[in-house]
Swiss-Prot record:
Belongs to the TrpA family. It comes from Aquifex aeolicus (strain VF5). Keywords: Amino-acid biosynthesis, Aromatic amino acid biosynthesis, Lyase, Tryptophan biosynthesis. This is Tryptophan synthase alpha chain. The keyword Amino-acid biosynthesis applies. HAMAP family: Trp_synth_alpha (MF_00131). The gene is trpA.
């Protein structure tokens, strides 16, 4: 379909797994966030998740909730998110950009306008954590018109029937939430349980599956990369961006990416 599929094909040829990096626009301020985004892109990010701040981020843990709050206090609007995407797209023409947004802003701005502007400014697809696949038909129809990829979320509790539904809704990739609850860096992850679920996904779905929620270290990336198509890292990166530790951010991304090379 586009940049996302191309990226997974390229990684497969290189025998690597995808590093999906998430950061929030406008946290701790717009300029620092732009530097942070550039830093993660320069140091090994394969797919970028661009966080759009929202007042009620139900799926997010404490670190990312703070980022939402601060970005909103900084007055970050859709225009700022688009400006950031457009700026990054000029410098990084081949890296897929996913907009991570709750449904309310899409609805408020208008599905048509939201999709059209996103596409114009270099966005490749959306992750909408509070929009289940069975309620996404209307949005997906508009996204299709603008060649935008819908990335649905699956949970540890997803049944086989649900996994099939998630797979059908996905255009180019699926996102498996590794643990129940909210996002956030964790010391230990239940690898065996995650592996079992990812294997179930693979059996029922032919699209790449990336694993997120809790991934923060090289060993997490290596372990999960041994059975999934990639890992999503958010809270650990957002925390460093919030502390304006831009160099540390680049180093963490390099380290995580090392864990995803065979």
């Amino acid at each position: 379909m586009g940049r996302i599929s191309d990226k997974f094909t390229e990684l497969k040829e290189k025998r690597e797994k995808a590093l999906v990096s998430y950061l929030m626009v406008g946290y701790p301020d717009y300029e620092t966030s732009l530097k942070a985004f550039k830093e993660v892109l320069k140091n090994g990010t394969d797919i970028l998740e661009i966080g759009f701040p929202f007042s009620d981020p139900v799926a997010d843990g404490p670190t990312i909730q703070v980022a939402h709050e601060v970005a909103l206090k900084n007055g970050i609007r859709f225009e700022d998110v688009l400006e950031l995407s457009e700026t990054l797209r000029k410098e990084f023409p081949d890296i897929p950009f996913l907009l991570m947004t709750y449904y309310n802003p899409i609805f408020r701005i208008g599905l048509e306008k939201f999709c059209r502007l996103s596409r114009e400014k270099g966005i490749d697809g959306f992750i909408v954590p509070d929009l289940p696949p069975e309620e996404a038909e209307e949005l997906k129809a508009v996204m299709k018109k603008y060649v935008l990829s819908f990335v649905p979320l699956g949970a540890p509790t997803s049944t086989r029937k649900r996994i099939k539904l998630i797979c059908e809704a996905a255009d180019e990739m699926t996102y498996f939430v590794s643990v129940t609850g909210t996002t956030g860096a964790r010391e230990k992850l239940p690898y065996e349980r995650i592996k079992k679920k990812v294997e179930e996904y693979r059996e029922l779905c032919d699209k790449p599956v990336v694993v997120g929620f809790g991934v923060s270290k090289k060993e997490h990336a290596r372990e999960i990369g041994s059975f999934a198509d990639g890992v999503v890292v958010g809270s650990a990166l957002v925390k460093l961006a919030g502390q304006k530790k831009i160099e540390d951010l680049g180093n963490l991304v390099k380290e995580l990416k090392e864990g995803l090379r065979e």
